[in-house]
Amino acid sequence: MLKQFVLTVLLLLVVANSVEAQSAYRFKVDVPFQFVLNGQTLPAGKYVIERTDPARPNILTLKTVDRRIVRLVITQRVEKDEPSTASSLIFIQRRGKHYLFQVWTVAAMNGNQIPYALDKKVDEQRRNNVTLVMLRAKQ
């Protein structure tokens, strides 16, 4: 009986640690504007961003809270000098459109960057004329 109790407690600890580790790679953001992701315009709304496989940190899932829209996002690794202070999405704003550009998780020095955040046809001079918009995750 004591052995079963100890095994149950250990199992609960493992599950709790697993859930805590997963939550570091999952967060919600309320996006107040339409945005472009991989050439498709997505509506404003509440989104969940998550890394579904820790072994593949460059593959993210972006979905609306109601799961009506689900997108698999293949990204490139990007780094910064200081850890991220909050989970967030970075958008490039250009000519009235917002393009999902980067995804950062709290306390991480490595983020995810969408390779073709801008139209491929845009020349280099236009690419330099952009504004960055950051949306922080809900606490």
Language-model region placement:
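Positively charged n-region of N-terminal signal peptides that target proteins for export
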Residues: M1-Q4
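Mature extracytoplasmic domains of secretory-pathway proteins
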Residues: P57, T61-T85
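Sec/Tat signal peptide C-region and signal peptidase I cleavage site
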Residues: N17-A21
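Beta-strand-rich cores of mature extracytoplasmic or soluble domains
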Residues: T75-Q139
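A short tyrosine-centered beta-strand micro-motif
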Residues: G45-I49
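Bacterial N-terminal signal peptides
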Residues: V6-A16
